[in-house]
């Protein structure tokens, strides 16, 4: 699936206007960028970094904790509804990602 980034919560790895390719149902490891359903508003998707998996789901965090309007597991707790793992940022062409970008090592 394709997802467009909005907001500044994932800077510097992702910026508003970036387009991502997401593999639905892919295995997730700590450090991966993921797309999940926002708890309390399941029609809205969020892009966050998976930090750890516990008994109640994944703890998801924003890279930019100071972003206005940022919401992550610090606000709503662990998340069970992970839609998929970000595979790559495909647009815009030529922009390098931040040191914690989307490449998987």
Feature locations, PLM:
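Extended hydrophobic leader/signal-anchor segments used for secretion and membrane insertion
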Residues: 1-105
């Amino acid at each position: 699936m394709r997802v467009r980034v909005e907001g500044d919560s994932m800077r510097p790895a992702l910026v508003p206007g970036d387009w991502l390719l997401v593999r639905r149902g892919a295995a997730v490891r700590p450090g991966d960028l993921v797309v999940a359903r926002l708890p309390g508003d399941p029609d809205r998707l969020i892009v966050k970094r998976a930090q750890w998996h516990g008994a109640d789901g994944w703890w998801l965090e924003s890279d930019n904790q100071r972003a206005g309007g940022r919401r992550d597991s610090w606000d709503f707790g662990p998340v069970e509804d992970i839609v998929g793992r970000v595979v790559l940022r495909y647009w815009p062409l030529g922009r390098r990602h931040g040191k914690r970008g989307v490449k998987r090592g």
